[in-house]
């Protein structure tokens, strides 16, 4: 792993595409490649943060959230540096909602937490956690609404696993804002294939018998990567308590100061800078400070 980190540091200085290079020149799994790529890019989204562009991009998501009644819990999956999540908070902050945001990259969440502090958006209703790509520390049917914003996009091989996990945890609705290969131009389709993006979301949803609709969006950050909202309705009447659980035993955790632990497995989940760590392979790079 030291060799990989050294190599990516050199690639960064040469402004190379980490994800593409590692897919071609390493034996790392897709989830490891995605995590390392985002870890080393941490801070780039905050540097380019433009509130007006974020507003345009997320307005359809907010509109869809507001169509859902009696929301008590919301998860932003693959929240990165929390730039989009901060807008969601600003629009819904006065509501009685308990918010969760997660990402595979601790470094991105760490920088995002500083952004939320700067915006005075951090409080006890917000829970940040670093997760494994396809494991969420929640009971079935425990989160009312789950949203994504291009976070399934780079996980082509694992897209179905991720969607099934999101569906397991969701109670009312999934709102996935993800690339729509079917409406992309030829150049866009080639770009999606070259970048190893998910191109078959509709087929995955149909295969699993989900009730869903596709809503085209008017604005895209990149016209070569057009997105749509994939709105999956669940509306189960069963509701479990929304609290962190052990991702191995799927049972309750005990909370002691700055960590959670499982009595069944003995696994400890530390809390760093108000971010609970469920990802066993997380890294922290000094450059994030």
Language model regions located:
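Short alpha-helix
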Residues: 192-212
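A short, conserved alpha-helix within the catalytic core of class I
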Residues: 154-165
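Core SAM-dependent methyltransferase catalytic element
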Residues: 218-244
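Class I SAM-dependent methyltransferase SAM/SAH-binding core
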Residues: 75, 81-133
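Conserved beta-strand signature within the Rossmann-like core of class I S-adenosyl-L-methionine
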Residues: 171-180
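A conserved beta-strand element that flanks and buttresses the S-adenosyl-L-methionine
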Residues: 147
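Short conserved loop adjoining the S-adenosyl-L-methionine
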Residues: 135-140
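Conserved class I S-adenosyl-L-methionine
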Residues: 1-66, 289
């Amino acid at each position: 792993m030291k060799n990989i980190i050294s190599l990516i540091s050199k690639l960064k200085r040469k402004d190379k595409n980490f994800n593409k290079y590692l897919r071609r020149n390493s034996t790392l799994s897709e989830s490891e490649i995605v995590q390392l790529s985002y870890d080393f890019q941490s801070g780039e989204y905050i540097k380019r943060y433009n509130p007006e562009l974020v507003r345009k991009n997320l307005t359809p998501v907010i509109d869809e959230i507001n169509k859902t009644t009696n929301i008590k819990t919301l998860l932003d999956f693959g929240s990165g540096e929390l730039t989009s999540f901060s807008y969601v908070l600003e629009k819904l902050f006065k509501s009685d909602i308990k918010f969760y945001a997660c990402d595979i990259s601790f470094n991105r969440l760490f920088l995002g937490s500083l952004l939320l502090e700067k915006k005075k958006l951090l409080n006890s209703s917000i829970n940040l956690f670093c997760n494994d790509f396809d494991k969420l520390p929640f009971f079935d049917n425990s989160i009312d609404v789950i949203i994504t914003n291009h976070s399934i996009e780079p996980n082509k091989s694992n897209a179905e696993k991720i969607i099934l996990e999101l569906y397991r945890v969701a109670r009312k609705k999934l709102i996935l804002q993800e690339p729509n290969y079917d409406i992309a131009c030829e150049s866009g389709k080639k770009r999606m294939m070259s970048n190893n993006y998910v191109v078959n979301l509709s087929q995955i949803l149909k295969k699993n018998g989900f009730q869903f609709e596709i809503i085209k969006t008017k604005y895209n950050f990149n016209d070569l990567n057009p997105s749509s909202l994939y709105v999956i309705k669940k509306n189960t009447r069963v509701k479990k308590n929304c609290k962190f659980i052990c991702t191995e035993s799927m049972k309750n955790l005990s909370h002691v100061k700055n960590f959670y632990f499982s009595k069944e497995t003995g696994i400890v989940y530390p809390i760093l800078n108000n971010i609970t760590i469920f990802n066993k392979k997380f890294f922290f790079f000094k450059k994030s400070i």
